[in-house]
Regions:
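Active-site-adjacent substrate/metal-binding segments within catalytic domains
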Residues: 38-63, 67-76, 80-87, 93-96, ...
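Extended acidic/polar, glycine-enriched regions
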Residues: 111-115, 180-259
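Accessory beta-strand-rich segments of carbohydrate-active enzymes
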Residues: 3-16, 37, 48, 52-159, ...
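Accessory carbohydrate-binding/adhesion or oligomerization-edge regions at the termini
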Residues: 1-42, 121, 471, 475-478, ...
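Beta-strand-rich domain onsets/edges
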Residues: 559, 692-724, 730
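Substrate-binding/catalytic cleft of secreted carbohydrate-active enzymes
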Residues: 173-175, 300-302, 310-527, 532, ...
Length: 795
């Protein structure tokens, strides 16, 4: 058994020519590294026609004579979207799904002891009669060999697949499938715990290996314990010869039980309230073509930064590296068959059914996956078709339920869970529809598969009010899905902004639906999710203030709502050095069902009137109520406040004077406000809002140590313009000039504008080890540098 990474040495042409597959090729070809995208696109105003092409890849290699009598298998992690593989001019394999892996047996076409050629005809055109194509699609589909490639040299008989079914109590059942002549062969399995203890089992090929492992630690969201299974295919020795290991497969898995009932989701017998986001697997410039480290980073952002416990992989199976990270972090995954609204003819459906089978077979050992999507997202009912998809999935994996995201009520429910894209909220009333009014079978599970961002696209540079409205809508969706009995939870739409087709988005080919921008910089809405984390240390405390406290940014210069998104116990507010008030979450208000409801800051006067106006406590409280009402209602006063003015013997001029002094209007001196997050009785985080005195450019490299190999690696970089207190400057739109010293290259442009005070870039390795420095320069701010260390795996 030999394994080789095959991500180097590829040549690419954007226009396929039959000469590409021949042993000798005189075409002009571009050297590329895998993962590869057929076309690097601009951040916005891109053209989806540019990546739609019939292109080709070619790789030459030497096949040693020692491979005689062996099986040579070439595996592609994903090729978007229709791939035909040739070896030495001979057509060997065709694969018509851009989101699943496939393996090609090269053995019969090889010339041993000679140079050989593998070529791939890659069709990324969107007129293909395969999923997800056929209708309009609200995301780009890109093209190319965008996941890793590998070559395996095996015996003629080998293991094709290993699948382990488990229960939380330790029961397991191991299934295998083989290729080649295996008469007389046996199986040997070993399960290794995280502590290193081992348990061995043996079995025959015709039956699954079953057993019970005592004292297991179940895989859960809080404790994602992973075990390792190694299965060997053994040919018994004869005539005194020892047994021979023909093949070996190692997988990671977890012991856990998933159950959906009318009351919700139960993991290992414990109810779980799903709080998740939808994730597209696309990135700025590169589309789908990003290495494992970037895929894993998204899982870390979802779990650690955003506080999610679940993710929906909209709208296709996603990177194995992403799923590995979800396994490790305890992030539940709802993955689904490729497609968007459209259902095609019988040929299209046959391919969709094959996609379902490949999705399940390739992903079913991941304990993080708790739900299979057996419908095309948002599609109409099709009883015959969806009976087949559900049957295929349950036959290959009886341990997990199925669902299917639909856009309409009372849809035919062939799955185990009714998943509903709920875009009913318009800012008033309930943020999600009544479960009973939607599901066609109240005895089954129910979840909200999408809500939120599509209803109010929000750019990072939108005004303060717009950004706040989006955040509060996300909060309402989370809250109401929790509050409604029988709803298993919700998946907000969506994690990050994404490029889309001309029929969608904001006219610049971007859907600004995310709680983050395309570079994974957080918008205000991200704090809604992040603040739901349970803090275990001061570093876990979130404190995000919705307002910049700049009157000139608000309509009419009249201050309006100010909200704080936090998981602290309380928030203290100061004006200058004067304490105003302490605020706690309203456990009976609009967001009472949330673990950590957002806090409305509705008192900007507090005890100031006692200190500076000589009022007694009762009078000060009445007067403060008048001033805060004026702030809330644009200087209007209710009859109650007018009565209070009479009671306090306050004239309108006197009330106006105090309003100008303690709250302010356009032209009055700007106050400095300090917000303090209190946790366990002490201040652990502070936000200051005051006029900007200096501008800094902050550069964060999220993965500063890179490893070149088995593919190129990549550093994700976030850029933010901040003031002297570290607060984001959302209207800073300066250009940032980027340059690199050392073995890295910038993906995309070397000059990037700040959007909403934020930007980003990606730095790709080049095959060399060393130290690289990213230089960031912005007019009006000091230069900023960041250091990245690059290692080569072979080194």
């Amino acid at each position: 058994m030999e394994h080789y990474d095959w991500n180097e040495g590829w040549l690419f042409t954007p226009r396929f020519d039959p000469a590409l597959v021949r042993p000798e090729c005189g075409l002009e070809l571009e050297p590329v590294r895998i993962p590869h995208t057929v076309r690097v696109l601009p951040y916005n105003y891109c053209n989806e026609n540019e990546y739609q092409c019939l292109c080709g890849y070619r790789r030459e290699f030497f096949a040693p004579r020692e491979w005689a009598g062996r099986t040579v298998l070439l595996t592609f992690g994903a090729v978007a979207h229709d791939a035909t593989v040739f070896c030495n001019g001979r057509r060997l394999f065709h694969h018509a799904c851009g989101y699943t892996a496939f393996t090609v047996d090269l053995t019969s076409a090889l010339h041993l002891g000679q140079k050989n050629v593998v070529a791939v005809r890659c069709d990324s055109r969107e007129d293909l009669n395969i999923p997800p194509f056929g209708g309009q699609i609200d995301h780009l589909t890109y093209g190319g060999i965008y996941r890793a490639v590998s070559l395996d040299i095996k015996e003629p008989a080998y293991l094709r697949d290993v699948f382990i079914e488990t229960k939380a109590e330790g029961d397991f059942r191991i299934y295998t499938s083989t290729v080649g002549e295996t008469v007389g062969c046996t199986l040997q399995a070993e399960i290794r715990s995280p502590s290193g203890s081992r348990a061995a089992y043996s079995g025959e090929l015709s039956l699954p290996i079953t057993g019970v492992l005592n004292g297991v630690h179940p895989w859960s969201i809080e404790h994602p314990t992973l075990y390792t299974l190694t299965v060997q295919l053994i040919r018994p020795g004869s005539a005194g010869l020892p047994d021979r290991v023909l093949d070996e497969k190692t997988i990671r898995f977890g012991f856990r039980t998933v159950q959906f009932v009318a009351g919700g989701l139960y993991l290992n017998g414990q109810r779980v309230e799903l709080r998740g986001l939808n994730r597209h697997q696309s990135y700025a410039y590169q589309g789908y073509a990003m290495p494992d480290s970037i895929q894993r980073l998204d899982a870390q952002i979802l779990k650690k930064d955003l506080g999610c416990n679940a993710v929906r992989t909209s709208h296709s199976p996603q990177s194995p590296a992403f799923l590995d990270a979800c396994d490790e972090l305890g992030l539940l995954v709802f993955t689904e068959m490729p497609g968007w609204r459209y259902i095609g003819d019988e040929s299209w459906k046959a391919q969709a059914l094959q996609n379902c089978r490949e999705m399940v077979c390739q992903c079913r050992n991941h304990p993080s996956i708790f739900l299979w999507g057996a419908r095309v997202n948002g599609s109409a009912d099709d009883e015959a078709f969806y009976k087949r998809t559900n049957e295929a999935i349950h036959r290959l994996d009886p341990t997990r339920p199925t669902a299917g995201a639909r856009n309409h009520r009372k849809s035919q429910l062939l799955e185990d869970v009714y998943a509903y894209n709920d875009y009913s909220y318009r800012g008033r009333g309930a943020a999600c529809e009544a479960r009973a009014a939607v599901t066609s079978d109240p005895r089954k599970g129910y979840l909200i598969s999408e809500f939120g961002g599509q209803q109010l696209p929000t750019k990072p540079f939108d005004d303060e009010t717009h950004r706040l409205v989006q955040a509060l809508r996300y909060a309402a969706g989370i809250n109401d899905s929790i509050a409604q009995q029988g709803v298993a939870g919700s998946f907000g739409w969506c994690m990050a902004d994404y490029n889309t087709h001309r029929e969608f988005g904001s006219g610049d080919r971007i859907c600004y639906h995310g709680v983050m921008d395309m570079f994974r910089n957080p918008k205000l809405s991200a704090a809604v999710y992040a603040s739901q984390k349970t803090p275990r240390s001061p570093s876990d405390i979130v404190l995000e203030v919705s307002s910049g406290m700049a009157l000139g940014d608000l309509p009419g210069g009249v201050p309006t709502a100010c909200w704080v998104f936090t998981n602290a116990e309380s928030v203290r507010l100061y004006r200058g050095n004067d304490y105003i008030a302490e605020f706690t979450p309203d456990r009976h208000g609009r967001f009472a069902a949330m673990t950590h409801p957002p806090i409305e800051i509705n008192d900007f006067v507090g005890s100031l009137l006692e200190k500076y106006e000589g009022m007694d406590q009762a009078s000060a409280q009445m007067a403060a109520a008048i001033l805060n009402e004026m702030r809330r209602d644009a200087m209007e006063l209710s009859p109650l406040s007018k009565a209070r003015m009479l009671s306090l013997r306050l004239s309108w001029n006197e009330v106006a004077r105090m309003y100008y002094k303690y709250i302010g209007v356009l032209g009055t001196p700007c106050a400095a406000y300090r917000f303090e997050a209190v946790w366990h009785g002490r201040t652990v985080r502070t936000v200051v809002r005051e006029p900007v005195q200096s501008v800094r450019l902050e550069c964060t490299v999220h993965n500063p140590i890179l490893t070149d190999g088995p593919t190129w690696d990549c550093a994700a970089v976030s850029l933010r313009a901040i003031d002297q207190n570290g607060s984001l400057l959302p209207y800073c739109g300066e250009a940032v000039q980027l340059s690199v010293d050392g073995p890295l290259k910038i993906i995309g442009p070397s000059v990037v504008p700040l959007r909403g005070g934020m930007a980003g870039t990606y730095l790709a390795t080049t095959g060399e080890a060393g130290r690289a420095v990213l230089h960031c320069r912005m007019e009006g701010a000091l230069d900023t540098d960041a250091v990245v260390t690059i290692r080569c795996r072979d080194a």
